[in-house]
Amino acid sequence: MKFNVTLAKGIYMKRIFLIGSAFIGIIVGAGFASGQEILQYFTSFGTLGILAGIVSTVLFAYVGMMLVWLGSIFKAEGHNDVIHKLTGGTMFGKVIAWLVDIVLIIALFGFGVVMLAGGGSNFEQQFGIPAVYGTALMVILVLVFGMLRVDNVVKVIGNITPLLIICIVIVAIYCLFTMSGSFSELDTLAKSHTSAVPHWFIAGVNYVSLNVGLGASMSIVMGGNEKNSKIAAWGGLVGGIVLGLMIMISHLAIFSKIETVGHLPLPMLGLVNDISPILGVFMSIVIYLMIFNTCLGMFYSLATRFTEIETKQFKIFYTIFTLIGFAISFAGFTDLMTFFYPVIGYMGIIIIIVLIYAPFKVRRIKKQGKSLQDL
């Protein structure tokens, strides 16, 4: 009997770990890997970036827990299922669903454009090749593989995420142990860089709502596949906490070398190059593949929002969205991130408000003796 209890706990822990890892994989993308997100949202506030990181950690923990938990208790297949059941199909619910849909559409396009520009910045920073060539190659790859629907390629590249996380942690530890200069000196240098938003607290909130805008639907679907809502909730909670810790580790790494990498479009790549140019080339390729993976996912999802997959209309929409993104990408990776990310983040607060309201609504539904699945 004791063995069975231990075995059950082991199985539960494994499922919690898998859900947590999947949540991290949904949120962590090429923007995080580049380090530019961390620089603008956290490091640019100097030592106060730690406080912003704590705010993000708390919010990511709550948001991760709620998204996966809601998916589980409602057996949801998408975010609209949850919104419909929470609002009872009222006009208010339809308005909220429409607003969330708008947020997701803008987020998909905005992220796609920023990532196209990021592909060019990657080439320029690492190899000295003009950014336009790196971006043009990215556009060609996105168009070709998007038309072929080579899912296996995307899955393989998606598996790079755990390796990337390990690399970031190792790089961060190295940077902290080799840090030169006092915290006060580094703080002054860090604060001289452009911030995405005006205050560290807003940065912590905006960064979470920015990422939730893209990760909400997938996280809910993931929760819908977990029968045990407690395991789902713990998995989302653990994933959110680990994600927050990764943010703070990355922030401290960039902060410790701000004089060396603060001016670079991809600070994390600069940190790796500082350790070894050979590792820098490897990291550059990994980031480029992650950018490709993100771009493909963004424009593919955007096109499927308006058309059916594998139709002539899909190919037309997909091509048009990608080419428009290519044209806008000439504004530059850093400038585009500074513009698009805060806007998407402010809009994404709508989703966080829904998640704060959700547990109270669920409790009320249960008190009325209604089945959550039959709503």
What kind of feature is each model-predicted range?
Residues K14-A33, A52, L104-L108, G112, ...:
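Hydrophobic, membrane-embedded alpha-helices of multi-pass small-molecule transporters
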Residues K14-R15, S44-I50, I73-A107, Q125-A131, ...:
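Transmembrane-helix boundary/entry motifs in multi-pass membrane transporters
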Residues I16-I26, G53-V58, W98-I106, Q125-R149, ...:
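Transmembrane alpha-helical segments of multi-pass small-molecule transport proteins
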Residues A30, I105, A131, V142, ...:
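Hydrophobic alpha-helical segments and their helix-loop junctions in multi-pass secondary transporters
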Residues A52-G53, K85-V100, T161-L176, G239-I249, ...:
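Small-residue-rich segments of transmembrane alpha-helices in multi-pass membrane proteins
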Residues V55-D81, I249, A253-K257:
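Juxtamembrane transmembrane-helix boundary signature
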Residues G118-S121, P130-M138, F145-L176, M337-L355:
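Membrane-interface loop-to-helix entry segments
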Residues S192-H193, I254-P277:
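Membrane-interface interhelical connector segments
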